[in-house]
Amino acid sequence: MHPSGLAVLEHENWIAYLTGVVACSPRAAVTRAGGSVAILTDLPFDWFNQVLIERDGATPAGVLAGVDEARKRGNPFVVRLREGADDAFVATLTRAGLVAKERDPTTPGMAAFPIDPDAISARAPGELRIRRVTDDAGIDAHRLVATAGFGTRPEVAAGTACHDLLDRPGCVIYVGYADSEPVVSGLGWRTGRAIGVYSIATIASARRRGFGAAMTARIMSDGVAAGCDVAVLQASELGRPIYERLGFRTVVTYRTYGDPVARRHG
């Protein structure tokens, strides 16, 4: 498959994940206008307060509608544009007063195709046991690990991982245990032929033991078993080498634009 096709699958999956998990947040709002989507919450994490171009033929008015909605809520937010595909909207954001962020300005969107069975086999260290979450105790463990691993406030995990997701088709939540203690989290989100890999976080005391790679491989393997032949994710620069060893390659780069006048979360 051409990288442009993989980029489309990555983008569709990310939006499906974002708009899906924020249903766990009571004050979340997902609005669509003119081919753009605004995902807005009270959570202090910009993934869940952002505007994205969703459709071909998106309009400047649609993007600005999302920006206006975000400004009305008053929380910090970002707009992420795909380099190349969304370049036409840079001028729109500039006129609206948004600026490219200096810190963490880009996010690589990555895809693995075809999924290499050798790359994802035999990845779990012997002391790690990965379990699919089926109850509230598992949700609590997932939230605990995600909060510790990402260094975020507890409400972020609480607002994006909840019991209702356990009944959602295509969504699987995971926790990995070592010595009976939760040490690594993960979440898989399926859209068509793509399995999205999300919420890979390892607690500090369990890092550099291959647990994050093992969780990623498990999500990919379960996706293959469900009929997927493409895996997608959004990487940090720190995590990119780990994902590349599992067969992922960058297919799109997102550039982040922020609103200088938006207030900061307290």
Go through each PLM region and give its residues:
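A structural microfeature
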Residues: E102, P182-V184, V252
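Conserved active-site alpha-helix within GNAT-family acetyltransferase domains
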Residues: D86-A100, A213, E237-T253
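Terminal substrate-recognition subdomain of acyl/acetyltransferases
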Residues: S25, M110-R123, A178, W189, ...
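N-terminal charged segments
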Residues: M1-R73, A85
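Conserved acetyl-CoA-binding loop-helix of GNAT-fold acetyltransferases
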Residues: P60-V67, Y198-A204, R208-S221, A225, ...
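Acyl-donor-binding surface of acyltransferase catalytic domains
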Residues: D56-A137, G151, Y257-D259
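A conserved beta-strand-loop-helix scaffold within acyl/acetyltransferase catalytic domains
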Residues: P154-S205
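Conserved GNAT acetyl-CoA-binding A-motif
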Residues: R73-E83, G223-A235
